[in-house]
């Protein structure tokens, strides 16, 4: 059997054996998603638990236990919206190829089992939750929906999701940015019913919202030229379009009492192993034409945030330039303790960028000396550094006009 066919069959088997649609919160969303019709190019569109497999590489996905926070909470709750950079298990409950519910994903996590995080260990919001004095944030589809489960935060992020509704559609089900905001709106309504409007508004306005979205609008839309988009939008126009869409969604969050937002810029995916392989880079040099688009988006988005500050003066919003923080690690890798900068820890092909991580046999022994975990995602070690930068600019300044520690510091 040709190797590519064999690997495709393995990937299909992993999808079929690791999902069983049967619990309330996820089943409700699954039914809504199946009944959802949407024009391909539209932007703002409107318990399933994995079963145990006889394979040693699959596990029942349970809620992730958190280490005890080191201090009293600095904010009431921590809410997360985004894509695979911060998905903590949402896609475990969806019919999709974009999933991380099998080893070696999660092998270096606190529990050493896969949780749905696209990493060998923790993702940035895990580190930041502990900094805030809160437990790890549970997935919206991975809990019962009771207010008690959600009172300290919810993670709505979904791998393959984008700002554009159809971004990532070729991978299967995913929850777009707009849909995630609708899910939060539903959560807010549950809070109002349970504790009253004033108490719910006070909780939300004092909580932190972390948004990491947009990379799939390049990977699975613009760079793949879906709907002939490259002939409709030049990169500059496409970036303006995305930034405008994000700004509008933040205004929508503001209208339901959100007042503290951390908006993440996009990382240098032109340096990701997949594009090093795809563009046949001989020596691992980054794909500059891709990185130029990402830098331009971050520039446009940062300016849009400046305008939001002027329009909504009581909105505390931070923009964190992931490109700056990530490139500092890539350029100064030895300073940070890395010695493998171009190859992923797990994958197949040159730079391990041809096929994503689907088997423990594909993974390196020591992920901590790698920058990249798989085709697109950084290792736990990189996530820890980036989280430090978001919190207090420990390694390099990448957040403007302040960092998260400043945002949540008690006001005198």
What is the meaning of each model-derived region?
Residues 2-412:
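Conserved active-site regions of diverse hydrolases
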